[in-house]
Amino acid sequence: MSNNVKLQVLLRAVDQASRPFKSIRTASKSLSGDIRETQKSLRELNGHASRIEGFRKTSAQLAVTGHALEKARQEAEALATQFKNTERPTRAQAKVLESAKRAAEDLQAKYNRLTDSVKRQQRELAAVGINTRNLAHDEQGLKNRISETTAQLNRQRDALVRVSAQQAKLNAVKQRYQAGKELAGNMASVGAAGVGIAAAGTMAGVKLLMPGYEFAQKNSELQAVIGVAKDSAEMAALRKQARQLGDNTAASADDAAGAQIIIAKAGGDVDAIQAATPVTLNMALANRRTMEENAALLMGMKSAFQLSNDKVAHIGDVLSMTMNKTAADFDGMSDALTYAAPVAKNAGVSIEETAAMVGALHDAKITGSMAGTGSRAVLSRLQAPTGKAWDALKELGVKTSDSKGNTRPIFTILKEMQASFEKNRLGTAQQAEYMKTIFGEEASSAAAVLMTAASTGKLDKLTAAFKASDGKTAELVNIMQDNLGGDFKAFQSAYEAVGTDLFDQQEGALRKLTQTATKYVLKLDGWIQKNKSLASTIGIIAGGALALTGIIGAIGLVAWPVITGINAIIAAAGAMGAVFTTVGSAVMTAIGAISWPVVAVVAAIVAGALLIRKYWEPVSAFFGGVVEGLKAAFAPVGELFTPLKPVFDWLGEKLQAAWQWFKNLIAPVKATQDTLNRCRDTGVMFGQALADALMLPLNAFNKLRSGIDWVLEKLGVINKESDTLDQTAARTHTATYGTGDYIPATSSYAGYQAYQPVTAPAGRSYVDQSKNEYHISLTGGTAPGTQLDRQLQDALEKYERDKRARARASMMHDG
């Protein structure tokens, strides 16, 4: 049998052993996908149910609004008729009539919106197969589908639980197999311990220097963004600032350098970077948002209000106080200020006043862009009112500009408008009319909130608090970091500072070493280009070595079916107690040693080379006795591993030369014959004792099997007269196929059964593998292919089929 055929047999065995894992993994993935699809369908069905509920609510609102509209129309018509029939209508009657008309118009607008909403919902429901004219029937059908989908989801989840349980069982089998190979892994670990220590030390050193490496990378990026020389005063100042922030705050120097890059990309110069970096870091620690978001907001407000670099810290404090004193969060405040800040600057409103307006609107649940557009509309309408807005303000007696044409303080204007409403005792409808005329439909609600906040003094209090907020962000960060988490961050920052300092000291040497290595690699590349043939030969040799390593690794997989068989023995005899389990595990570990890597063997040999040289002959005599004792005790078990022997023949031949060279290298020291005999006898005794311990599970299993056979015989399940059928069938099988020829159908040598895991004979019976031969002589001879010849073949085949049918009917066969 060739080496390629051997490898194919091994790979096929591995594939068959791993097939249950693959099938269960595939089933698990399929079930998970089905569950996701069912969950998606269930969400869609629940969405349809929500649409039905929304349609009903909207329809109910439409009906109520329709009744109210009809009533308002009747009242307006009655008032109009009364007003027309009155000779001298009063001003109060005119106002009442106008109010009734406006109420009817508002109800008509609301009725139209609800009608459009109902039609839109009808179209959406129709798109998913729900008819609103037969809503109760379709809703019941939808509920039935939801119930069916829910039941299907529960069934799929139960199936997934069962598959997961099977996966857990197979994983337990695999873990037992891995435990059997643990001894081989320990041998490999001994050989790799020195390399592992060196690698761990190297990785620890690299990890310690990594903060300095990353800090240097970010400094180079910052230098490229701002466009200055590496040794310039600007870069030195920025680097010094980043290091100081890393040493004195919870942020690291790497974080500070990252913030500097973000501010530089936002358009900041060196002075702006130095001013904004500490503020950005503190804001990020305080509001737990990214440095990119905080830097963008900070620099955006600085640009919108056209403030100098020395005001950047104050801007950060105002923003932090806004989030702490009002209901505004980071996203809402950022969106609102994006809309309001440019208009506020043109209207002469400070950043503190703008933040107060945004915070007050967030307290009233007008958030994000709605707060921004509302504030912007209020500022722009009051800064330069035109048309009806101007007339309305004039009627209220409110001036928006002073004698020089400059816009008066916005808060003062809002207070005067609220005071005018109260002075003239305007009703809510009249106030709403003025608000819509002055500020527009969308901004009227925001204007009402701001007028109330201005009249109650809330805006003034917030503005005063924001103006006195210097240093509040740093104070907030100190409070938030005054705990174990903050101490850990400070420790991490200090640790990274150590790595940065070490990297700074070694950067020159490391760069020189790397550059030198690069030069040598380039020289090697040039040599390869000049010597293509030789380089190709080296590549072929390396590929052959890799293939040899793969073959040796595949040989280790032979242990899998053997371990499976031993596991089956342990499972069948588990009731025999902890002693059997312990010894059975020892057997499993011993067989797992088949897969010892060659590298681990070499490492073990090298580790003990000096001791072996000194005590070579006593050691060799001792282990020679051990091997002799093991061979004598394991002779009956040898046939079990006979199919594995040819696999190791080729590997043994290749290693024999290397082993002979190693023996010659360590020139053994001679010992006396008596000493060697004593060592050999001791080895024989040790080997026999070891073999007895390893044979204990098999002996116990044989006793268990004998007991089961006795019970089955007494019950009449088996017949003792059939004891010799195994030997008879084996002789027939050997005589039929011969010996020494490879049979691909069973992947084994003739005369040996293919390996199967050993199992307890619970309910199994004899499988007839004999072959019948019939010799029929006819006088006169019969040529092959004639009608008589075909009739004989048909008769024999029919006889064989009937025989197999009778055997199956008797229930005495497993096949």
Curated annotation (Swiss-Prot):
Signal sequence segment: none
Record bears the keyword Coiled coil: yes
UniProt keywords, alphabetically: Coiled coil, Viral release from host cell, Viral tail assembly
Chain segments annotated as coiled-coil in the UniProt record: 67-163
Lineage: superkingdom: Viruses
GO biological process: viral tail assembly
Pfam assignment, any one: PhageMin_Tail
InterPro entries: Phage_tape_meas
Role of this protein: Serves as a base for tail tube protein polymerization and acts as a template for tail length determination.
Family per similarity comment: Belongs to the P2likevirus tape measure protein family.
Protein name: Probable tape measure protein
Species the sequence originates in: Escherichia phage P2
